[in-house]
Structure formats: structure tokens, C-alpha cells
């Protein structure tokens, strides 16, 4: 139910706008992160015409098809690169996407299912994330009304759940993809499950600045770092 004071009382309006903004920011990043994590599992970074691509990118395959059609040649023949890219993309689509019916958020839903199948998230967490997606849609499409209604403890729990699951997916990605790809070794005694990605740290910092009154603390730390 709309509460008129939520629009005109600063002590009500500002926190509600902060929650809405952070919720949407976190969710959009979370969805991108989920999709990219699964894509990276199947893909290989590559360069073409001086531009970085993933070998399963449609843009990369389209560009290779154009070069093959025009009869261009390369150090590795473009026909071979095209065949490899098509094969890699077909495996990704079969294992991550084809099990999900076409519709809104198909790539995201397929990626969540893949993470569940590989024991990165649980079935309950998968269902929870899809429910959070529904809440995100409410905020994006009915933001004016939702600010008028205000936010509940359940919205705070949704934010906490996203932060928690995101950190765990990033830790899994670090162990399964990044460590071997970048030849990273953790210090002795470090727990790889506790690893936080740069995005985890930034989003946690934003949370603490917005909701925990730690803006000055982060400002001072940044100022000290910039002096180095």
C-alpha cells in the first residue's frame, strides 16, 4: 500500500531510493556474472583484427565467416579457427542452453541450471534467485509505486542472499577457471572458498557506504592509496 510520507519525508525517501538503486545494481551485475561464468567455462580468449573476443562469441564467428567467404588467410587458417569456434559454441549451447525453453531470461536461467548441475548452487538457491528476479522486475517496471510502498526486511534478505551466492560463484570460478588459466597460487593456509572477486569487494564497499555510514572511512582509505 502506498504511503504518501515515503515520497515527502526525507528520512523515508532517501533510504528507499538507496535500497531500490542498490538492489537493481546488484541484480544486474549478478545476472551478468552468472552468464559470464558459464560462458568462460566453455570459451577461450582470442584476438581477431586487434580486438579481444571469446571464441564462442557470435560476433567473432560472424567475422570469421566473413573472412572465409572473402578468401582471406591468416597464420592459423580462418577455416580452422571458424570450425573450432563453431564446435565450441555448439557445445556451450547444448550443455548450458538447450535444456531451457526459449523465453525471457533463457540464457540466465540456463546458466543457473548449469551451476546447479555442477553443485555450485543448490536447487533452493536457484529457485530463490528466480524469485529475486521477479522482484527485480517489479522494481524496474513499477519503481515509482514501489518507492511509495517502501521496502521490507525480505528485500534486505534478498540483497544478502545475492551477495552471498555471488561470492561463492566467484570463488568457484577462481578455483575452476582463473587459477589454471592465470597460473595463480594461493598463500599457504588460504581457503579458496573465501576468495572474493574485485566485483565482490566493490559491491560490498558500496553497501557499507550506503547503509553502514562508512563513506568517510572509504574516502580516507582511497585518499591514502592515491598518495602512493
Regions flagged by a language model, labelled:
Residues 1-134, 138-228:
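Amphipathic alpha-helical interface elements
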